Amino acid sequence: MEKNIPKHIAIIMDGNGRWAKKRGLARSFGHMEGAKTLRKALEYLTEIGVKYLTVYAFSTENWNRPQDEVSTLMKLFLKYIKNERKNMMKNKIRFFVSGRKNNVPEKLQKEIEKLEEETKNNDKITLNIAFNYGSRAEIVDAVNRIIKDGKENITEEDFSKYLYNDFPDPDLVIRTSGEMRISNFLLWQIAYSELYITDVLWPDFDEKEIDKAIESYNQRERRFGGVKNV
């Protein structure tokens, strides 16, 4: 039977620190390995026909981590943007960042905006990176913009237009490392997404693990709150 490939996959990339700790390495090594895994995952998902990939890279709560780790993550993201620019243009990957811009280093924010502009017409796959992102913050920001615009009698469709992007809702949400929680990720958008949780740590999440997640997705019956006709 032919596989049904999700149009939009969202991933909570968890376990970088634990991956490094198991090997007696600093947490920063886990984050660097996680960046390599993201590149491989993006290539494979593009190959099999996924159109949107949203990844949870840095939450609004992650500012509470040790300062040296936060600094490492900022530098790593800047390096990732610079290193992947040519690859994204070559493979027609659109780059987009969802999240608040406050606190993000100015140099990093400029590089984000530059790559978003350069890749805005790429249409093979969209890589949406949730960075300095929290879903409650996104909802609050949307409400404040609605109030500012003086809107009344807002529908769900109207509300969605005030979120950080207009991408379709995720079909499948994957969380690595075995944690059984959403962690303030896409609370509005994943109302009817299928969830897949694996004990595999993010740096070890390879093509075979992606296939397992999609196989599990294909075994689900998506009813969106309804019932199957008998």
Curated annotation (Swiss-Prot):
This is Isoprenyl transferase. Its cofactor is Mg(2+). Keywords: Magnesium, Metal-binding, Transferase. It comes from Fusobacterium nucleatum subsp. nucleatum (strain ATCC 25586 / DSM 15643 / BCRC 10681 / CIP 101130 / JCM 8532 / KCTC 2640 / LMG 13131 / VPI 4355). Homodimer. Catalyzes the condensation of isopentenyl diphosphate (IPP) with allylic pyrophosphates generating different type of terpenoids. Transmembrane segments: none annotated. The gene is uppS. Mg(2+) binds at D14, E194.
